[in-house]
């Protein structure tokens, strides 16, 4: 039996972070779990919450680390080891300041762009060569600190678009699973 793909939505645990820009990865992971018809449960060895099943015809484990964003690797590393998933078969869904609000991009490897959650995952895996679903949250206005900006709730105008953006990011994740990186990029980057 082929090893599953590991899909990780990044975010911070707790109700006070649930609607923040930094938590779009969790929002998309929740949508994927709903599409799989499953609910998250605790994974004892890693501490993350997981859902196992099938997406786009593949065996998939969707995970939400239950530690803070900057420590995500502490739970992603043990999950990857437990399921014997190499970095190239891991998809991390995360917010991205360098993309305009609502833009979705797919890539593999590369830098972290100041995203400490990505840095933590890369350090835990010993590799940056995992796939990424990048969800644009835009840059903070004026001289606002990016670290504070990502922990704020979406504006009321943005909030109206977040459900559609998360659905598109979930669709992009399924295309990545089904088609592989380059064909999925060709489709998603044309949106």
From Swiss-Prot:
Its EC number is 3.1.1.29. InterPro entries: Pept_tRNA_hydro (IPR001328), Pept_tRNA_hydro_CS (IPR018171), Pept_tRNA_hydro_sf (IPR036416). GO terms for biological process: protein quality control for misfolded or incompletely synthesized proteins; rescue of stalled ribosome. The keyword tRNA-binding applies. The record marks 95 as: Stabilizes the basic form of H active site to accept a proton. GO terms for molecular function: peptidyl-tRNA hydrolase activity; tRNA binding. Keywords: Cytoplasm, Hydrolase, RNA-binding, tRNA-binding. Its main location: cytoplasm. One of its GO terms (cellular component) is cytoplasm. The active site is at residue 22. Gene3D superfamilies: Peptidyl-tRNA hydrolase (3.40.50.1470). It catalyses: an N-acyl-L-alpha-aminoacyl-tRNA + H2O = an N-acyl-L-amino acid + a tRNA + H(+). SUPFAM superfamilies: Peptidyl-tRNA hydrolase-like. TRNA binds at residues 17, 68, 70, 116. The record marks 12 as: Discriminates between blocked and unblocked aminoacyl-tRNA. Signal peptide: none annotated. It is found in: Cytoplasm. Hydrolyzes ribosome-free peptidyl-tRNAs (with 1 or more amino acids incorporated), which drop off the ribosome during protein synthesis, or as a result of ribosome stalling. Belongs to the PTH family. Monomer. This is Peptidyl-tRNA hydrolase. It comes from Mycolicibacterium paratuberculosis (strain ATCC BAA-968 / K-10). The gene is pth.
